[in-house]
A protein has these predicted regions:
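Right-hand nucleic-acid polymerase module
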Residues: 1-146, 157-306
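Extracellular, beta-strand-rich glycan-interacting domains
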Residues: 154
Length: 306
């Protein structure tokens, strides 16, 4: 749970006030006029975001039936000539690299008219921005410049690892590319998303906003109609399956995107109202087993009506 929740005005009432040209204070008496939302930057929020993107990546690998060695684990650095330009707009370097990859001679073929063309190449990918923390520089007795670089996973990339390495090194900088050993490599790359916190803000404010920034391919982890049907059935099996999913015997909370894709708002509210009280009471009994039943009830009601 977020440790620094923000209180905001419900955007729904802002829109209603604009549409009917009335003061937003007219809706201040509504129960959901003020909403408590996660801050998105505390350790808990970043950890939750990392886990949710790992679930998407795991879903991509299952849907495409990929083995880890069919994915590429990459670290991309940037040469001085293009460093400032890349640091200002990291997504441009990624986009240009992907454009060059799609125009690789391997994808050049003759069309029906006899003219050469490039066949369409699409595959999922993840890029995470990181600014060096200076740890290795200190070990070598050097001063760190906290340079920006990318960590990436290319899922089912149609090129060999050395071709990807040569493409990046031909115009952007150094590259270290290897086949992925296991899904732990995906978690390793996504852990750099947690760099967006005070403990790692040793750089300027502008650069700090980019530290841990995530870039993914269009539609990454999107659910198909068949996926929605299967997930809907699985989530309705029990109270546990509604809140979490197991991957390699590890429990992960269900991403909000999956729940909203499979159910309507009314269905989600109805399901939560029926399950949360019982689940919360069992958690209170387990965590505060040394307290009296009366004290447990007080804690339970405080948490339930927060």
């Amino acid at each position: 749970m977020c440790t620094r929740q923000l209180t905001i005005t419900n955007p729904h009432y802002k829109k209603l006030a604009e549409d009917f040209r009335v003061s937003i204070k007219c809706f201040s008496g509504r129960e959901d006029f003020k909403l408590h939302v996660p801050c998105g930057h505390c350790d808990e929020c970043l950890r939750k975001r990392q886990q949710q993107w790992f679930l998407r990546a795991n879903h991509v690998m299952k849907r495409l039936k990929l083995r880890p060695e069919q994915c590429l684990f990459c670290t991309f650095s940037i040469k001085p000539e293009v460093y400032e330009q890349t640091k200002e707009k990291p997504y441009l370097a990624i986009r240009r690299f992907m454009d060059r990859l799609r125009k690789h001679p391997r994808f050049r073929e003759k069309g029906p008219s006899g003219r050469y063309r490039y066949r369409k190449v699409r595959f999922p990918y993840i890029f995470v921005v990181e600014f060096a923390d200076g740890k290795r520089a200190r070990e070598r007795g050097l001063e760190s410049t906290h340079r920006m670089h990318f960590h990436a996973i290319l899922f089912n990339c149609p090129l060999y690892w050395w071709q990807v390495r040569d493409l990046w090194e031909s115009c952007v900088g150094r590259a270290w590319v290897d086949p992925l050993n296991s899904e732990a490599g995906v978690r390793y790359v996504l852990k750099y998303m947690t760099k967006d916190c005070k403990a790692h803000q040793y750089i300027s404010d502008i650069d700090a906003r980019k530290n841990g920034k995530l870039f993914v391919s269009h539609g990454f982890g999107r659910l198909s109609k068949e996926d929605i049907k299967i997930m809907r059935e699985n989530m309705l099996r029990s109270s546990t399956s509604w809140f979490c999913v197991y991957i390699n015997n590890f429990r992960y909370s269900i991403p909000r995107y999956w729940r909203t894709a499979c159910f309507t708002k009314d269905e989600i509210k109805c399901r939560n109202d029926s399950l949360i009280p019982a689940v919360l009471w069992s958690i209170v009994q387990q965590k505060y087993r040394g307290l009296s039943p009366f004290q447990q009830q007080r804690i339970y009601y405080c948490l339930l009506w927060q």
